[in-house]
Amino acid sequence: MNDIRVEKLLINYKTLEQFKRFKEYGNQELSMLEDLQNNIIENDSESPFYGIHIGHTLIARMSLYRVRAKYDAYFEPPQDYLELWKLEVLPDYRGRNYGKALVDFAKSFQLPIKTNPRINSHGFWEKMGFQKAKYEMERDLGENPLIWMPAGVREKDV
């Protein structure tokens, strides 16, 4: 598994075509097609998309957004953190550590991470070292975020 390489995905029509394979398998909430289409339309060259290819086939992907410290409502001391969204591995490739490789890549930035897990995915996130954030109604708006914190970071009191 040492040969798994996570790479930033280009914002182009080839990536858009590859994302369509995920929409067939994933839930609407996981669809990154609209996000990618908006980035293409806006000519936004800073891609938040990362993925793993086997040959020329994209088999796992996620969105990773950096949130600036001034908007940090989760961690102490206040700092930049990452929001990890829409992690998905195609069904034929699940159970082979590709999801773990994506999460480990996000952790390699040594910034706290927040994610909103899908139903039935809590076990995966717990294995990855994530914990439930203390719920705060105004901040979390009905979501149940999970967080991961590197050494020296703690959860903000609500």
Model-predicted regions and their roles:
Residues 1-41, 53:
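Short amphipathic alpha-helix that is part of the acyltransferase structural core
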Residues 27-86, 94, 138-148:
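Conserved acyl-donor/pantetheine-binding loop and adjacent beta-alpha core of acyl/acetyltransferases
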Residues 85, 90, 118:
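Residue-level recognition of the GNAT/N-acetyltransferase active site
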Residues 89, 94-108:
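Conserved acetyl-CoA-binding loop-helix of GNAT-fold acetyltransferases
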Residues 103, 108-120:
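Conserved GNAT acetyl-CoA-binding A-motif
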Residues 118-143:
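Conserved active-site alpha-helix within GNAT-family acetyltransferase domains
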Residues 144-158:
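Active-site or metal-binding loop neighborhoods of secreted/extracellular toxin and effector enzymes
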